[in-house]
Amino acid sequence: MWRLKIADGGNNPYLYSTNNFIGRQTWEFDPNYGTPEERDEVEQARLHFWNHRHEIKPSGDTLWRMQFIREKKFKQTIPQVKIEDDEEISYDKVTATMRRSVHLLEALLADDGHWPAENSGPSFFIQPLVMCLYITGHLNSVFPAEHRKEILRYVYSHQNKDGGWGLHMEGHSIMFGTTLSYICMRLLGEGPDGGLNGACTRARKWILDHGGAIANPSWGKVWLSILGVHEWVGCNPLPPEFWLFPSFLPMSPGKMWSYCRLVFMPMSYLYGRRFVGPITPLVLQLRKELYAQPYNDIKWKSSRHVCAKEDIYYPHPLLQDLMWDSLYILTEPLLTRWPFNKLRKKALATTMRHIHYEDENSRYITIGSVEKILCMLACWDEDPNGVCFKKHLARIPDYIWVAEDGMKMQTFGSQVWDASIGIQALLATELTHDIAPILKKGHEFIKASQVRDNPSGDFKSMYRHISKGSWTFSDQDHGWQLSDCTTIGLTCCLLLSTMPPETVGEKMDPEQLKDAVNVILSLQSENGGLAAWEPAGSSNWLEMLNPIEFIEDIVIEHEYVECTGTGMEALVLFKKLYPKHRTKEVESFLTNAARYLDNTQMPDGSWYGEWGICFTYGTYYALGGLAAIEKTYENCQSIRKAVRFLLKTQGEDGGWGESYRSCAEKIYIPLDGNRSTVVHTAWAMLGLMHSKQEERDPIPLHRAAKLLINSQMENGDFPQQDTTGAFKKNCLLHYPMYRNIYTLWALAQYRKKVLRQPTGI
């Protein structure tokens, strides 16, 4: 049976950590673990997901929850409550619902103080990892039989009814997801007509019916070329010479969004090397299966711009295609011939130096899953028996997650993010006796996860920004600063610093708090918005060069509403507790941030949320920022417009539910059937309470609270519903802890702001 291990280094000589692996999550298969009854419980969870996989696409993330509940012998002792029709919600019933939720959260807390959770969803994470390990000859050693079984379970679980796979688990079938998933099944041992319910046959039919694998988008073409089932001559150029560009040029690496820069870094190395894995009999067989015509008859040069219509979200502008054609026809032939090939050699060496730098500064985790696989492959190409490749192999378990829908690859983990919002939700409950043990552990985790140093050496020459004092999305070893994780980490530490240390532990050193403020201030743009990883400011026209057909706004760093809102909340609290630190800069930050929120509000009163779905999410965080600087419904038109938006989108059942299609279409779209989700309902409630809706008309809040209370399950959990996380306009991420954290937070604020505490309590 599968078991989750926390903060475990496994005595691997190729692993090292900056804080003794705090926050690390790894899964192991133990054939002797679990009783027959416990194993049957796991099988029942798998069967339940399978039977409902086309209704609720994301997993409930139940396997580790079952494990923790068993290990801690948790039993929900507080009776479940329900609100009947026409019944007035009482203070006691809300309190009981909250306490039930808190008790479950305590059982789910890991020993190091964080809540483990899945953070996945795209169909281009685990599949390329399988391809990489197949190429390097490590597939069976890294993924033994039980691992391969669970990866196949995951692939089968998310196959659409038409036989294809989407860009993410909720999406319509596309060539990219379908080709990668088909290849993944074949590399894991399924025959061309194998797989559960004819999975391979159905997938291959979808591929051939839609033009064959030649119609893959650019990333698909690259991965197929790496495997040897596509030719590099059929790809648009990815010249590593880009890494030689001086910083004053508008198209230099330092001008790019960090993720884009670091994905195309190893990709350009592999392109420059024209790297191709071993041409095995299976690879030769795949060449026959993936195309509608014989492989050797394909006109690769003319296929570079071919892409299935199902995959296109961001069509290439004509200017971009002209640029690729110029590089392809004029530049590449020169760079592969003497004497210009000396420049190519220098570029490859420079690119590899950057790869090693990023690997070392992230303890071989790298910034995320897409880059991780490519960097690992580049290190193998450099030296298959080298230490760098072995260090990469040692960090693969950090990315692997197992749930009832199988084994998948994480983005890299949401440990710090989930812990920080979870602590804030608990603090809002004011259930001091119930939450004290959780607060102490959570406080220690957040303190231990703060990044203590900047990247090594002359980090600016490596296009890196300051990170000292920041928090990452996952753990300290990851090393990559993130503005909203820093703002909520700072907020948690500030709030906990005002509480008795015997209850919540020793407060953080004020100098470390100030370091966090320095990072936040450094990431604000001239327009007042807060960027995510690095300062924004590159020219927007560079987005015309986005080569990725299925996502948008990836070339340069941008500002984000939710980062800005949490930044305002954090700095208002910091200013109150430390009024003398960079006073003018903090005041200026708040003024400019408010201006940014005013300027980015949509005509309907909402704000677009980049990292959650979508307008409900963005509006909640924007209202939090405005409320922090004492903007009110009475004195702020933006708040009045936002309230009208939220009230207008409330459903008949009292809740809110927003479709993921809002992200791509950039207009509010309710869920099919006007369904509500507990997470969207919680976000909307919190947003309305930021505006003091309870003082104007509490009825919308009563209706929403009733839905949340009645949705709570027998053990204190809430149901897993539609996916609520998103990124880059057209892709989704699954955050299963949201259903526990935001529901608790909303009910806590509802009890405090809307209901009156009975006399004597």
Curated annotation (Swiss-Prot):
Annotated Pfam families: SQHop_cyclase_C, SQHop_cyclase_N
Please provide one cellular component term from the Gene Ontology annotations of this protein. Answer: lipid droplet
Enzyme group, top EC level? Answer: isomerase
Instruction: State its Enzyme Commission number(s).
Output: 5.4.99.46
What tissue specificity does the UniProt entry give? Expressed in stems, leaves and flowers. Lower expression in roots, stolons, rhizomes and radical leaves.
- UniProt cross-references to PROSITE patterns, sorted A to Z: TERPENE_SYNTHASES
Can you tell me which residues form the catalytic site?
484 (proton donor)
Start and stop residues of the PFTB repeats: 148-189, 513-555, 590-630, 639-680
Sorted keywords for this record are: Isomerase, Repeat
- Asked whether the keyword Ubl conjugation is assigned, the reply is no
Q: Which reaction does it catalyse?
A: (S)-2,3-epoxysqualene = shionone
Any one GO MF term held by the record is:
oxidosqualene cyclase activity
Q: Which GO terms describe its biological process?
A: triterpenoid biosynthetic process
Family, as annotated = Belongs to the terpene cyclase/mutase family.
Question: What is known about what this protein does?
Answer: Also produces small amounts of beta-amyrin, friedelin, dammara-20,24-dienol, and 4-epishionone.
NCBIfam families, sorted: squalene_cyclas (TIGR01787)
Q: What is this protein called?
A: Shionone synthase
Which species is this UniProt entry from?
Aster tataricus (Tartarian aster)
